[in-house]
C-alpha cells in the first residue's frame, strides 16, 4: 500500500492506520483468511520473493469474490433442480457457464483424483459416487479449516504439484496470453 493510502487511512479490506481490521465480523466472513492466501501465494513464487501487504489484500479480495461468484452460479443451478447440496460437478458446470472453461478439464482430473484419495483415506477403497461432499470430505473442502488450512484432504503442495504436472498451471493450456478464457471473457453474472 502506498504512503498516501496509509496516511489517509485508506486501503483495501478496511484496515485502519494501526493495521487492525475495521471490517465488521460479517464482512470479515466474506474473505478467506489472509494468512492462508499469503501461504498459497508464497508457494507459487520463488523462495526469495517478497509479497506486499497490498498484494496480499488484493488477492484475498479477488479469490474470495471468485469463490462467491462460482459458488453462487452453482447454487442457482441446485435451487432450480431442487437440491440442497452443491457438489464438485456443479462447480465445474458453473465455471464452464461463467467462461472459465480452460480450467474445467484439469479440475475434472483433479476432482477424480481427490475422490480416489478420499476413498482410500477413509478405508472404503473406492471413491464416492455422485460427487456430493460426504461427512469424511468436509475437512478438505468445507468445515474444519478449509481446503488449504485444515486437517485432512489433499495438502496444498500435492494439489500444486498435481496441477503443475498436468501442464495446466495458471491456465497454461498452450494458448498463450490471448487464450481467451477466464475473467477476461467479459461475462457478468445476472
Curated annotation (Swiss-Prot):
Please give the record's induction comment: Enhanced by dehydration stress.
Q: Where mainly located?
A: nucleus
A GO term from the CC aspect: plastid
Instruction: Identify the InterPro entries for this entry.
Output: CBFA_NFYB_domain (IPR003958), Histone-fold (IPR009072), Transc_fact_NFYB/HAP3 (IPR027113), Transcrpt_fac_NFYB/HAP3_CS (IPR003956)
Q: Which domain of life is it from?
A: Eukaryota
| Residue ranges, annotated region (Subunit association domain (SAD)) | 59-70
Q: Which GO terms describe its molecular function?
A: DNA-binding transcription activator activity, RNA polymerase II-specific; DNA-binding transcription factor activity; protein heterodimerization activity; transcription cis-regulatory region binding; transcription coregulator activity
Keywords noted in UniProt: Activator, DNA-binding, Nucleus, Transcription, Transcription regulation
Tell me one Pfam family matched here: CBFD_NFYB_HMF
Could you tell me the Gene Ontology terms of the biological process aspect for this record?
Answer: long-day photoperiodism, flowering; response to water deprivation
Region: Disordered, residue numbers: 1-30, 168-190
Return the annotated DNA-binding positions: 32-38
Query: In which tissues or organs does this protein occur?
Result: Ubiquitous. Predominantly expressed in flowers and siliques.
User: Could you tell me where this protein is found in the cell?
Assistant: Nucleus
Question: Spans of biased composition, class Gly residues?
Answer: 172-184
- Could you tell me what this protein does? Component of the NF-Y/HAP transcription factor complex. The NF-Y complex stimulates the transcription of various genes by recognizing and binding to a CCAAT motif in promoters.
Subunit organization: Heterotrimeric transcription factor composed of three components, NF-YA, NF-YB and NF-YC. NF-YB and NF-YC must interact and dimerize for NF-YA association and DNA binding. Binds directly with DPB3-1.
Similarity section: Belongs to the NFYB/HAP3 subunit family.
Mind telling me what this protein is named?
Nuclear transcription factor Y subunit B-2
- Gene symbol here is NFYB2
Amino acid at each position: 500500500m502506498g504512503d498516501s493510502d496509509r496516511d489517509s487511512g485508506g486501503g483495501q479490506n478496511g484496515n485502519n492506520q494501526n493495521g487492525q481490521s475495521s471490517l465488521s465480523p460479517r464482512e470479515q466472513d466474506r474473505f478467506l483468511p489472509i494468512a492462508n492466501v499469503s501461504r498459497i501465494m508464497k508457494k507459487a513464487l520463488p523462495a526469495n520473493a517478497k509479497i506486499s501487504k497490498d498484494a496480499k489484500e488484493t488477492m484475498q479480495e479477488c479469490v474470495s469474490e471468485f469463490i462467491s461468484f462460482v459458488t453462487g452460479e452453482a447454487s442457482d443451478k441446485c435451487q432450480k433442480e431442487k437440491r440442497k447440496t452443491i457438489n464438485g460437478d456443479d462447480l465445474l458446470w458453473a465455471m464452464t457457464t461463467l467462461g472459465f472453461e480452460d480450467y474445467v478439464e484439469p479440475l475434472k482430473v483433479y476432482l477424480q483424483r481427490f475422490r480416489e484419495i478420499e476413498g482410500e483415506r477413509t478405508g472404503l477403497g473406492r471413491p464416492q459416487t455422485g460427487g456430493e461432499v460426504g461427512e469424511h470430505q468436509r475437512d478438505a473442502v468445507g468445515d474444519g479449516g478449509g481446503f488449504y488450512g485444515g486437517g485432512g484432504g489433499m495438502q496444498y503442495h500435492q494439489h500444486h504439484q498435481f496441477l503443475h504436472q498436468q501442464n495446466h498451471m495458471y491456465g497454461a493450456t498452450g494458448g498463450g496470453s490471448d487464450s481467451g478464457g477466464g475473467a477476461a471473457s467479459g461475462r457478468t453474472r445476472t
